[in-house]
Regions:
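Short, conserved structural patches
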Residues: 33-128
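Alpha-helical assembly-interface signal, strongest on the long, hydrophobic N-terminal helix that forms
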Residues: 1-49
Length: 128
């Protein structure tokens, strides 16, 4: 029985890890193709939400998903996407967790994306 619990926990954590990794990558790609910072942030959140729900992981953003310096959305600039998810361990009742589950594991993913030199508002970064 303990071995079964270990396997169940490993599968749950792996599913969440795959979900946050995919969410970070998809959010970065959605932001990069948006055309502006405001619509990019919305698209990034939607893409991350979709990727997480595909893996059956509940998620809601805690602040901005896309981390960038001045978010100028100029070609050649790079930005980071960080996604965190707290998953509940298997067989732990929801009522025991409350709003912040102590019987859980936090899984994180980071993805860095660079805007194409000809993307964005027409301004090109000196690095292009």
């Amino acid at each position: 029985m303990p071995l079964l619990y270990v396997v169940l926990t490993a599968v749950t954590v792996q599913r969440a890890a795959f979900g946050v990794t995919t969410a970070a990558r998809d959010a970065a790609r959605a932001y990069a193709t948006a055309g502006s910072d405001s619509s990019g942030e919305q698209r990034a959140e939607t893409a991350a939400q979709l990727a997480m729900s595909d893996q059956s992981v509940s998620w809601s953003p805690d602040g901005r998903v896309v981390k960038c310096g001045d978010c100028s959305y100029a070609g050649g600039t790079s930005f980071d996407v960080v996604v965190h998810a707290r998953i509940r361990l298997p067989l732990v009742p929801r009522w025991l967790c409350g709003t912040r589950c102590l019987a859980g594991i936090t899984v994180s993913a980071h993805h860095r994306e660079r805007l194409d030199c000809f993307a964005g508002t027409g301004a090109v970064a000196p690095t292009c």
